[in-house]
């Protein structure tokens, strides 16, 4: 079973016969398909692994992955976006600008519904092997600080303004509507309804609790690739 989406400036009467000819003529077996849980779950608890590899340019690459359960809701999706953007700004200030130890710390978030509701937060950066432990400590400390105190008013307002502007700009983008149609039919959630109201309502306390709830679940993976000791 397939769902086809058409987004953009399409003349319906012109498109109908083409859809009937090229899609309507496809064979069907009347089978309802669904996802398959391959049981490849992210490991629980705290896990750290550091290994060395010869490199032409000696570099340490550090990856943190935090995982846990969280309901698949529009508000949680928005909170995750707030959290990653705040962390991006904090790490730019505390790691890149103050320490000068990396070009940047990248934060990625993913809220999943299938095969089970799950929240992922990944933090990645590269640095001089001699600075890896110090910078990794700062990264963890700033994440814990966000979970304990929430973001500053300045960071909160910057993210809020950006998200509202991006939302307004997205109304004109076909790709945005394509993704939202997919979310609606696949996940059963309208990612546009009430979006601006939720963004405007987000507080520092909301973000603090969201990050704290993730860290309290105690699932942290830290993997470091560095160079052999000479």
Model regions and ranges:
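M16 family metallopeptidases and their MPP-like homologs
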Residues: 1-7, 58-75, 96-201, 219-228
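PAPS/PAP-binding and catalytic site of the sulfotransferase fold
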Residues: 4, 15-22, 139-140
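Short helix/loop capping segments that flank catalytic or ligand/cofactor-binding pockets
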Residues: 14-15, 27, 72-75
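Glycine-centered hinge/linker elements that transmit conformational signals in sensory
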Residues: 18-32
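Bilobed periplasmic-binding protein/Venus flytrap-like ligand-binding cleft at the lobe interface
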Residues: 23, 80-89, 138-146
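A generic structural motif
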Residues: 29-43, 107, 153-160
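His/Glu-based metal-binding/catalytic segments typifying zinc-dependent metallopeptidases
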Residues: 31-90
């Amino acid at each position: 079973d397939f769902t086809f989406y058409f987004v953009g400036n399409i003349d319906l009467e012109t498109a109908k016969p083409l859809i009937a000819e090229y899609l309507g003529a496809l064979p069907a077996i009347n089978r309802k398909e669904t996802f398959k849980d391959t049981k490849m779950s992210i490991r629980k608890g705290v896990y750290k692994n550091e290994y060395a590899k010869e490199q032409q340019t000696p570099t340490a690459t550090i990856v943190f992955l935090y995982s846990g359960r969280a309901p698949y809701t529009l508000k949680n999706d928005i909170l995750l976006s707030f959290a990653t953007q705040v962390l991006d700004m904090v790490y730019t200030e505390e790691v890149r600008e103050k320490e000068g130890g990396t070009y940047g710390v990248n934060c990625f978030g993913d809220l999943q519904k299938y095969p089970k509701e799950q929240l992922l937060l990944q933090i990645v950066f590269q640095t001089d092997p001699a600075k890896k432990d110090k910078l990794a400590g700062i990264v963890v400390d700033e994440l814990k600080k966000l979970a304990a105190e929430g973001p500053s008013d300045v960071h909160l307002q910057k993210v809020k303004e950006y998200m509202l502007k991006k939302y307004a700009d997205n109304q004109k983008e076909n790709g945005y509507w394509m993704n939202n149609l997919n979310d609606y039919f696949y996940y059963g959630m309208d990612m546009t309804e009430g979006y601006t109201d939720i963004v405007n309502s987000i507080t520092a306390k909301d973000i603090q609790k969201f990050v704290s709830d993730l860290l309290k679940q105690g699932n942290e993976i830290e993997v470091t690739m560095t160079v052999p000791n000479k």
